[in-house]
Amino acid sequence: MPNLLIQGGQPLNGTIRPHGNKNAALPTLCASLLTDELVVLDNIPHITDVEKLVSYFKDMGSKVYWDKGAKRIELSHRDFGKAGNAALPVGMRSSVLLFAPLLHRIGQVPLAVNAKGCALGVRELDPHIEIMHHFGAEMIQSASAIDLKIAKPMQGCRHWADYMSVTATENFVMAAVLAKGNSILLNAASEPHVQDVCRFLVQLGAKISGIGTSRIEIEGVDSLSSGAFQISSDFHEVVTFLALGAMTDGHVEVHDVQTEHFDLIIRSFAKLGVSVENDGETLSVFPGQTRVIQKPLTSNILPKIEAAPWPYFPVDLLPLMIALSVRAQGEVQFWNKVYENGFSWIPELTKFGAHVVTSDPHRIVVFGNRPLRPATVEAPYIIRAAVALYMVAATIEGESRVIHADPIRRAHPGFVENLQRLGAVVHWD
């Protein structure tokens, strides 16, 4: 795997336009299978999982034109299924998002139970299979595979999810929009990328209400039409560059931001002593900030940032705020309420000299503003943890190395090039 070689200590200055959110792009691409008509998607990031989906569509007979420079994909699935077999793309966890589209199109989903994604913790197939069962699918299981099959059109249903799963919510929505009758999902995920998928389907003629809430109601339609849609900017990338600007005492502006999603995120920056200026569609940080962690009014209570399903603080952003806190003055607790392995990378962070105490698998305390030193660290297969390790290294004078940093490429195309434009001295080794 590629490594990042970093000469730290330079302030980052300049402007950034984030790429499209991969967590919106991938399910939207899968949802395009729900229509035979032309679909045009803009602001598609050039990442490996998109490449795998595009290859899969082509292998199955779809017509796909991808203008990588313009970040646009045009798709026509009228001939999908006339070539190849429906085996899901390997090496990408988002292949579960093909469950509903494939059941609608060809009536079956052959699934090898070894999908790979981040190393954050156990993520079940059961919620997806349970949802498909509610819509009428049958599961056939062997020692190494699970087949989902459906013999007749899906029927609308009411489902109360065990927890707010992003991908399970997206699968429910994709199943329901073409199911007969009405469907209701309770305890639905409401992240910005889930909202993107719903709005894309509405653009094609789906009837969805409750977008952005925990209760989604859908009236099934007979078919979906053609349409065009622009993927929202990646809020993970927005936070990454704002935090880097603050950590290196630089001036960074991030444009094309859906700032209506950032109220809680901006307050979380403020907890760590960083002021973020909101100017409509632009967020900025400026040099000269004190970066002192805010103490609660209640004495003897640690300040904390809790991550949980939206509209809580997004769990994927937690590593970035941990990195930021390492360079802040004071102590702060981080609580990951979602993944049991979300802090497995912390021992690598301490190699820089960071002082972090692990309370339990879901909680840590960072004691900030300790002397740091260059180091060679190993990134886990967790995208934002790899980014966080780079962020800390970028603030330390001298040469550091983040080995096995390739997970960054799963979400952040041109990451190193963007850093270099801002003044960072970093390259793939």
Predicted feature residues:
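Short, structured segments at the rim of ligand-binding sites
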Residues: 1-429
